[in-house]
Amino acid sequence: MDEKKLDFRRRFGRVFDRMNADTETAPHAQNQTFAPATNTDARFPECPNIYLLGFMGTGKTSVGKRLAQTLGYTFIDSDEEIEKKCSMEIKDIFAKYGEDYFRKLEREFIDGGHPASNCVISCGGGLVCRDGMPELVKSKGIAIVLFSRPDEILERIGKNDKRPLLNVENPLEKIRELLDARMPYYRRSGVMIATDKDLHKTVDHILRIYKRNTADPRQRRPKKSATAFQPPRAKK
């Protein structure tokens, strides 16, 4: 065994041993709802990206960073990438150009504004809530939808002026309203996992799903350079 494979085994051996456990006994098995089977054909690279979807406040950032650390992947936040390219905060993009323009930016990012492999992508809560977006995300990698109860979401995000859709008098009611509208898209987008358990257990559950739906992650290959992301021009 060469040095690279031996080093990978030392670092991640226990992780993949856990992933080989019987998936029927996964901690969240009772909460798991499967969308149509994830596409695993030859269009995927050997180490496809993991896309974390779901409403704001469901743990995409904390889960995503732990996943990336465990796999040795790069963590990317779609909102942060859009903010960097536009030199504007999300709330300002909404205020100046509107939600439809922001959703165009999200589509551009998913379509080619990031590396094609070796990444964990935390996606904005409404990213898949446009026609064709669930299918686009699933064509790029392994899609996981995180979900939580509305009261848990509100408790996690608190008062955050960076959440333009929740700057209303009754944010809890707004969360329920948005979840009802988005759930059909979420259900079409990937495996759904509740994030009401320990972070470590949630990450292990996702790792099992990832291994089951991809080529062996141990067969790593060099990361690809990110494609330059150019946001579309706003209509005047």
Spans of features found by a protein language model:
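NTP-dependent small-molecule kinase module
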Residues: D2-T23, D41-P45, R66, T70, ...
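Walker A/P-loop
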Residues: T61
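P-loop (Walker A) phosphate-binding loop of NTP-binding proteins
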Residues: F55
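Hydrophobic anchor at the beta1->P-loop junction of P-loop NTPases
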Residues: L52
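A glycine- and Lys/Arg-enriched "phosphate-lid" helix/loop adjacent to the NTP-binding pocket
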Residues: K140-P184
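Short glycine-rich anion-binding loops that position phosphate/pyrophosphate groups of nucleotides
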Residues: G125-L127, R149-D151, D198
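ATP-dependent small-molecule kinase phosphotransfer cores
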Residues: D77-L127, D131-K138, R163
